[in-house]
Amino acid sequence: MSGSDKLPGLASDAVLKQSIPVPDSFVEIKGIDYSKDSAYNMKAVDLIESMKNMGFQASSVSQACEIINGMRSWRGKHIDSLPEHERTGEFDDEGYQKSTIFMGYTSNLISSGLRDTLRFLVQHKMVSAIVSSAGGIEEDLIKVLAPTYMGEFSLPGKGLRDQGMNRIGNLLVPNDNYCKFEEWIVPILDKCLEEQEEGMKKMGSDGLNADSPACWTPSKLINRLGKEINDESSVLYWAHKNDIPVFCPALTDGSIGDMLFFHTFKASPQQIRLDIVADIRKLNSMSMAASNAGMILLGGGLIKHHICNACLMRNGADYAVYINTGQEFDGSDAGARPDEAISWGKIKAEAKQVKVYADASIVFPLIVAATFASEKPN
């Protein structure tokens, strides 16, 4: 090595490499300047707007809000200008086509306090249809019967089991809650079975079609449970009241599955039957009828794929917002970015789409505050 004080050319070229001229389209990274008066006690809408050029997941959260506002504000043709066969999907109060918004969420989000946010959306008819895992059905009902409590992630499982306490992350659900759930749901299942049997007796030449009183589906049972719970704190109550279908293709995967299993013995030899084929026809038909389709998917797995696959039936959704923490290296559905769904035809190539890598319990209340709840509902 030379003792010269001259900067080595190799190092100089590597460290001081010249950039191309910055394109006019580049946006400068900026955050929130709390030294300005406008930043104090900032509204959610303004906070989200200030996060737009912050980078990382802050920018993705802001983009998610833009996409949700886009699906909410989209308007198509007036119903009077459409031929009869095109008068499908949803229309606003003035008769213009509007987006059909599919919302999916996993059960843990209903177990958490996010349930109240989800209930708000259903209460005010801000979504068109829901897909949930089984826990998202039962936990909503159980919370009417008895509360869920704060715990800690680190509580030992053996001690909790001895105490009859079930842990969901840092939430605690006394096992007595599930006993109360059984006491509440069994008489309802008895009545549903009775109605199904009556429908079977009256079944005519049309056979067992989807409109038959003898045909019970998961969504029909969920609607009935929402009616029977009759409590305004419940998501399912408002779904029933506002005629918003709630689909749960894995309804047996949880406590409600336990109750259905137990009921097959109590009701022997007759057993209630639920038709999942009629439900997939109903969900897919909603998608095909939609003049514009948006997806808001909180979590991954079954709830995410079920909605994405329904949107395949119309050659893809027009808007998509994913919120989950899944990574794509293992090929999981939760980890897949929206671009993977584009390859399958489940999201349109030109769709507005984003994946927010975050815990939905943190970011979704903020997103709702800046979109659906930015103004008081009528």
From Swiss-Prot:
NAD(+) binds at residues 107-111, 133-135, 139, 253, 300, 325-326, 359-360. Spermidine binds at E138, E139, D258, H305, G331, S332, D333, E340, A341, I342, S343, W344, G345, K346. Its EC number is 2.5.1.46. InterPro entries: Deoxyhypusine_synthase, Deoxyhypusine_synthase_sf, DHS-like_NAD/FAD-binding_dom. Keywords: Hypusine biosynthesis, NAD, Transferase. PANTHER family: DEOXYHYPUSINE SYNTHASE. This is Deoxyhypusine synthase. It comes from Debaryomyces hansenii (strain ATCC 36239 / CBS 767 / BCRC 21394 / JCM 1990 / NBRC 0083 / IGC 2968).
